[in-house]
């Protein structure tokens, strides 16, 4: 996504999780619980990335412009925060993410894909959307392509989340996110 979150940018009421877990990471993958994705080579681990409604979140990012990043992350959506079904949870995540401080100057979005799918044989929901911004601090950034997968991990207390945000129109970074998505798997 984009700049660091600000407290006043959200127009959607999103939960703030109190669940605190931290899955051990490796040099080649990002893991949250049982959801795993390969890291994108050359993108740096981003220990500052967070989304208020997601626990156990781990991310790698690449600077596009000063103040504008592309990234991928895996995390956990918790039933105690209202995340119990993949479709509704994917939609809530998109609403919360698009209206968060990461998209300062949010000016709209266009949904491209909204469909049921599977990840490693597990039921999942996929959304791909273009999120548009008009941000005077980063005038060259038009927005991001956002890819969200919410995965039923077979646990009643949590769902797996993959989220990728890559600079609109940036074929190289979009391609790297697509390659990472193809490595998504459920472990254990």
Task: For each feature predicted by the language model, list its residue ranges.
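Short N-terminal helix-initiation segments at or just after the protein's N-terminus
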Residues: 12-22, 70-73, 89-99, 103-108
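Signature of long, low-cysteine stretches enriched in small and polar/charged residues
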Residues: 91-147
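Extracytoplasmic/secreted proteins, especially bacterial periplasmic and envelope-associated proteins
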Residues: 88, 92, 176-179
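Short, well-ordered beta-strand elements
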Residues: 157-166
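Short, solvent-exposed coil/turn segments at beta-strand boundaries
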Residues: 42, 153-157
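N-terminal targeting sequences that direct proteins away from the cytosol to non-cytosolic compartments
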Residues: 1-53, 165-188
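Secretory pathway targeting signatures of secreted, lumenal, and periplasmic proteins
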Residues: 29-89
């Amino acid at each position: 996504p984009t700049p660091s979150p600000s407290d006043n940018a959200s127009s959607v009421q999103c939960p703030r999780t109190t669940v605190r877990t931290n899955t051990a990471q490796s040099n080649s993958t990002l893991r949250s619980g049982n959801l795993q994705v390969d890291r994108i080579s050359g993108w740096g681990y981003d220990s500052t990335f967070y989304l208020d409604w997601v626990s156990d979140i781990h991310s790698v990012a690449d600077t596009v412009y000063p103040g504008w990043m592309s990234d991928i992350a895996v995390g956990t959506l918790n039933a105690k925060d209202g995340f119990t079904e993949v479709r509704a949870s994917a939609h809530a995540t998109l609403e919360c993410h698009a209206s968060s401080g990461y998209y300062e100057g949010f000016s709209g979005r266009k949904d491209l894909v909204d469909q049921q799918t599977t990840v490693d044989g597990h039921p999942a929901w996929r959304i791909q959307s273009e999120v548009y911004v008009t941000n005077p601090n980063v005038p060259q950034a038009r927005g991001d392509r956002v890819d969200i997968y919410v995965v039923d991990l077979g646990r009643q207390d949590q769902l797996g989340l993959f989220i990728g945000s890559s600079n609109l129109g940036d074929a190289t970074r979009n391609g790297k996110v697509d390659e990472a998505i193809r490595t998504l798997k459920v472990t254990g």
